[in-house]
Curated annotation (Swiss-Prot):
It catalyses: all-trans-octaprenyl diphosphate + 4-hydroxybenzoate = 4-hydroxy-3-(all-trans-octaprenyl)benzoate + diphosphate. Pathway: Cofactor biosynthesis; ubiquinone biosynthesis. It comes from Paracidovorax citrulli (strain AAC00-1). The chain crosses the membrane at residues 28-48, 51-71, 101-121, 124-144, 159-179, 220-240, 242-262, 274-294. Belongs to the UbiA prenyltransferase family. Its EC number is 2.5.1.39. The gene is ubiA. Its main location: membrane. Its cofactor is Mg(2+). This is 4-hydroxybenzoate octaprenyltransferase. GO terms for cellular component: plasma membrane.
Amino acid sequence: MQSTAPHRPPQPSRLALYLDLIRWSRPAGWLLLLWPTLSALWIAAGGFPGWHLLAVFTLGTILMRSAGCCVNDVADRDFDRHVKRTAQRPVTSGAVSVREALGVGAVLALVSFGLVLTTNAATIAWSLPALAVTIAYPFAKRFVSMPQAVLGVAFSMGIPMAFTAVGGAVPMLAAWLVLGNLCWVLAYDTEYAMVDRDDDLKIGMKTSAITLGRHDVPAVMAFYLAFVALWAWALAPFGLGWPLHAVLAAMLLQVAWHWRLIRHRTREGCFRAFTGNHWLGFTLFAGIVAGFALR
């Protein structure tokens, strides 16, 4: 006699849940953080920075972004259950407890700090405010009308750290690169916020998409153009030649493509624009690498 008990799908392992927690299958997030960090590392070193620093900043970027996901999901768990896109995240659904998520985040942050300890005192010092901003960002969405600016600071901390790791100090050049990167984060994370705008309005979440209102698309385009212009201006003295010029042209074409994706403000178009942003960062990084190699 066959059992009539309903079939239950196999439950995911703890490892699978932790990988989902840190968005392991969705690398676009850490790539957005990685490309400007590596670009700054190449600029600071005047070319290839060596395998040690390349490994430290690549692994550190992935680890800290993953730790940030843990903190973010704990902080947003009561909001995420009301948003279609985030309702099934491990912490929100109860598959991973708050204590577990914070534990995973702490381990990842400690491993990342261990990597920083192999650099120098200045870089270690800069890692502390970097950690503080990473923790603060999820809570900024409750109080700041443009929390994407706080994320922009968090996602730009690798730039001064790259300069201190190479030269022990942060030149004025790094400030211009940070400002440009901040504009880029404002552009792509506003696209991201446009995806969830209807849900965020219902639950009282503050985002740049809500703050900008009907000016969101022009503002995103202005942020993109400011990003390209600031990095082009900062890189001009290095004489990177045709690779940089070609890359800047390619970046402007990508910006135009983003306008086509978001101009009607559809969820699908805005999300596609956001997830495709890592190609913009990779394009810039590739131009910088080629420019220094051929200089």
